[in-house]
């Protein structure tokens, strides 16, 4: 009987010891899947469940080259705060879905020759850019001392570019645009379309070095169009016309 009790005590003691050991760290869940408009789908304006789908998003460090699929489309989420030394280009014929994932994407470009045009993201004519933020708090901005726009949509080519904003914040951009007939420190639209469904455009400043249209938050000009279904535009400034929004 004593021998049986001793043998029984061995596995019990081992179990108690194992219970005191720290649990192994679980691998971080890198799966990132949600609708194209954010954490959960919301009908707003012309964006309905009929044209919204769940997508699987690939991690992106914010500075490396984005890989597009055979349809020239990419779904990426920002895995950490990132500082770029060049603007992110969405080229003609390509579609980029970017989830900020609560992180900050900023530009540190300070070249005096390109201050006014050193936008964080450039959406070329014929390209599509879709922005969301599943966690909230994600920002597109410039680092301290750097000047430029948040997002520029289109250009002189009449082939329209499109930008759809469902979430995220475009803030802290200080544009010193030397071109005549331009503007927009947060978002500039030229021969393009910008639809804002959510998110925030705030605290951007259009210094307006040239004779341009102003629009500290948003400027749509030269056949550019801006439709606002939701979101917030606030506390933007311009030396000349319209601190918030200019449409000409």
Indicate residue ranges for each PLM-predicted region.
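Bacterial N-terminal signal peptides that target proteins for export
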Residues: 1-11
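Extracellular beta-strand-rich solenoid/capping regions of secreted or surface-exposed proteins
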Residues: 83-97, 107-133, 141-163, 179-181, ...
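Extracellular Ser/Thr- and Pro-rich, acidic-biased low-complexity repeat/linker "stalks"
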Residues: 28-45, 136, 164-169, 195-200, ...
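Acidic Gly/Asp/Thr-rich repetitive segments characteristic of extracellular carbohydrate-active
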Residues: 30-87
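Bacterial N-terminal signal peptides
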Residues: 11-19
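Sec-dependent signal peptide cleavage junction
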Residues: 18-32
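Beta-strand-rich solenoid/repeat architectures in extracellular/passenger domains
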Residues: 102-116, 134-148, 161-162, 166-183, ...
